[in-house]
């Protein structure tokens, strides 16, 4: 009913594009973030990387990932302009809230990638973690099957996926046209994802310094 009332043409691409495009972008961010850090460990260049950053893991991560952030955010701006400006998909609260949500998704996804490679500091395991988490996001975020109809455990687990919160912001902002204040729990959730690297950053630094990659 929500889809029909906010998509009177019953255009299926409105559903597909607004869910698959940000989901694929999120999956790419997971994979590229893990790969860019994991290759430093695999190629035994991690110590040199840290040395160039004055042995600061924070400077090292910022220097490596900020260019990615800019590129991914530009990609996000382009797909928002294309969907809402060119194709005229429903966007009842304007395009700016969706661009802000996209920036939050990009940052949250990058931080999740740091957590993935920090938890499993090998390239193959980190990429496996990233691909698995990213693919599951499509199923558990409420795109194809409503979360409220899932098992209560799965309903709770759905909150562990950034894409779920982006989807809820999309429903509130683009489809329903609510004020951004109504989506504050989802923005806060994405902010929490951005804070998660602080839990693994010291473990990641130890892996960069001491871990020996075994093919």
PLM regions with names:
Residues 81-82, 90-215:
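Membrane-spanning alpha-helical segments of multipass transporters and channels
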Residues 1-76, 83-86, 93-94, 179, ...:
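Transmembrane helix-boundary elements of multi-pass transport/secretion proteins
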């Amino acid at each position: 009913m929500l889809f029909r009332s906010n998509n009177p043409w019953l255009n299926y691409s409105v559903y597909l594009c607004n869910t698959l495009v940000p989901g694929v972008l999120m999956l790419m961010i997971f994979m590229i973030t893990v790969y860019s850090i994991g290759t430093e460990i695999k190629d035994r260049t991690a110590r040199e990387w840290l040395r160039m950053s004055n042995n600061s893991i924070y400077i090292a991560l910022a220097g490596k990932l900020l260019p990615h952030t800019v590129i991914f955010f530009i990609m996000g701006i382009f797909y928002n302009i294309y969907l809402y400006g060119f194709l005229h998909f429903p966007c009842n609260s304007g395009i700016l809230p969706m661009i802000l949500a996209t920036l939050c998704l990009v940052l949250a996804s990058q931080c999740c990638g740091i957590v993935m490679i920090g938890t499993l500091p090998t390239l193959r395991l980190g990429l496996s973690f990233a691909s698995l988490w990213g693919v599951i996001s499509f199923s558990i975020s409420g795109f194809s099957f409503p979360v409220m109809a899932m098992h209560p455990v799965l309903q709770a687990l759905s909150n562990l996926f950034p894409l779920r919160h982006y989807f809820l912001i999309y429903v509130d902002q683009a489809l329903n046209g609510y004020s951004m204040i109504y989506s504050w729990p989802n923005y806060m959730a994405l902010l929490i994802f951005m804070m998660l690297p602080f839990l693994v950053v010291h473990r990641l630094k130890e892996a960069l310094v001491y871990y020996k990659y075994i093919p």
